[in-house]
């Protein structure tokens, strides 16, 4: 038989950001615990609100599965004599296991027949195991921030006030400090705070609802969306929906109710990002827009109670947003009294990082690098690139960005436009922060793209240069995201930049800030980019072996890397693909310690040598011509023509002969052959079926 398991941890309000992971952890922890305990179970569900973490497991077996443990002893041939009597080896084994010799059996293994014992262990009752299991689960939960509360000897996000623990309707007894498990839950803190008993999940869901608690996050999310849409429609608008904000407010409330408020139309004259940031980031309000996406003077907020007088709640929220927007309007007006040009000097008071100097110093560095990049892409861009880089961080000195840090770049763009800057420069000021997330929007202007690359490269090389590199678990300066940003911008714009040159120039500009040798820093930065590029390409679905093969042949030119990978993937269908890969592996093993040598055709003694050499000379000329045009598919087809001569060579010619000059000549031929393959990829890394 099986029963239902129900656990609820009642707490003070846990931060919304902590809850999704905590519920996910509870699910994985109970699955692991039951599996390791050999207790069969069915579906696992989790529920959560700011004041409770809940876990329900269906069809939990009443006892562990029985277990048979087999213990091998000595080989049978040394365990019994010719008459079948047990030897000292067998008797000693039986004694060590606490069994009679008559209980000894035999088992056939790969190494022969051995004596053994088999113990049948009956499973314990589930009830006898759950107390410790659930207690351990609760005390093992981890949060981004936690502390010890009162006399508790373990850390938790917030103080625990009650524990509901039931199996088959009966309490699972355990105690965590002064909190004893029971069969009662509690209602909404303000609307129905009384404790109430429950006996199963169905009753739990019904009674929590009666007490103004909707424990299922997905249901709260649905209610919020539906009611917010209705409220926005009532003022002829629609909700500006945002999944992150929706997730946050879902975990901020136990019983969501909707309030629609308004603000003075004069605030609509502020940049829309200012209004949206004020509402969404700071107040957790949903903005309301018209059908064209223009902001309306309304907002939707999610309340956690049924208000006796909704108008009072509405006025309270309107008062809060009015103060926020009034401050924003003041900042907006005051900031415009000082031009962005004049704010650049103020960046000397803004620390970028104690080891890398001020934001002013950073601007001077990446401004120089941006000019270097512009010279290589299109010198006609240089003046606008220089201006964009100069003003890129100027808004860090404004009151608006000081209050709303999320608006950096956005306010720089707005203030630049208001001051009459070239619109391309204004846009580049904003775009140099892009992409904001992995897979996010990329800069559209060349000016924005170039300054973005320069800024990110300065950060990456700078932090590597002072030995603040990402670890497996931490990347506090978002260097992985910035490296992906550089890669994606270069690929998107198809810029003819090589990583080697870019890193070299960046490190030379940073030289006085470096705390490590420049060459060591350079090597680590390039390897860091290789890792980011490899992960990105594999995550995009490119075969692991093809990615590895192409990157091993060089990855400095990112645009060419993509072309090579695409050509290699198409070439996979060619009959010569796998045979060439196999031959390359074979040659690679032979050539491990060999360095380039000169080929002397006069030393060829086999027809297969001459055939391979002549075919190589013809193919190499055509391959080089194709590579000059970046025509990798054509180059690979030319290489495919070498398949038969290569096969014949390996079938008929012994490379590692005793005669040194002949051996050296044949190695030189192989090296010349496969060096041209390596212009595209290291075929030895290709996974073959043979």
UniProtKB/Swiss-Prot annotation:
Its main location: cytoplasm. One of its GO terms (biological process) is glycyl-tRNA aminoacylation. GO terms for cellular component: cytosol. The keyword Translocase does not apply. It comes from the Bacteria. Its EC number is 6.1.1.14. Keywords: Aminoacyl-tRNA synthetase, ATP-binding, Cytoplasm, Ligase, Nucleotide-binding, Protein biosynthesis. GO terms for molecular function: arginine-tRNA ligase activity; ATP binding; glycine-tRNA ligase activity. It is found in: Cytoplasm. The keyword Aminoacyl-tRNA synthetase applies. It catalyses: tRNA(Gly) + glycine + ATP = glycyl-tRNA(Gly) + AMP + diphosphate. Disulfide bonds: none annotated. Belongs to the class-II aminoacyl-tRNA synthetase family. Tetramer of two alpha and two beta subunits. This is Glycine--tRNA ligase beta subunit.
